[in-house]
Amino acid sequence: MLKVIEVLAESDKSWEDAASHAVTQAAKSVHGIKSIYIKDMEAKVENNKIIKYRINANISFLLD
């Protein structure tokens, strides 16, 4: 059986890095992560440059 949690993460490098950060942080409190589904992506802009890449994602993991 799998459980799904919704997470928000950000990075100053890329959306890929934000997704990796989301999985790394989630793995500190849940085990058996199987997948991440990116629901939404957003970028914060200042002075015409992207300064933050943000994601809203679902992470699926096995229940013990």
Regions found by a protein language model. Name each.
Residues 35-38, 56:
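ATP/adenylate-binding site constellation spanning eukaryotic-like Ser/Thr protein kinases
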Residues 30-34, 61-64:
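Glycine-rich loops and low-complexity Gly/Arg-rich segments
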Residues 42-64:
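A cross-kingdom feature marking charged/low-complexity
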Residues 2-33:
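Short, well-ordered alpha-helical segments
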Residues 1-7, 24, 37-42, 49-51:
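Amphipathic alpha-helical hairpins
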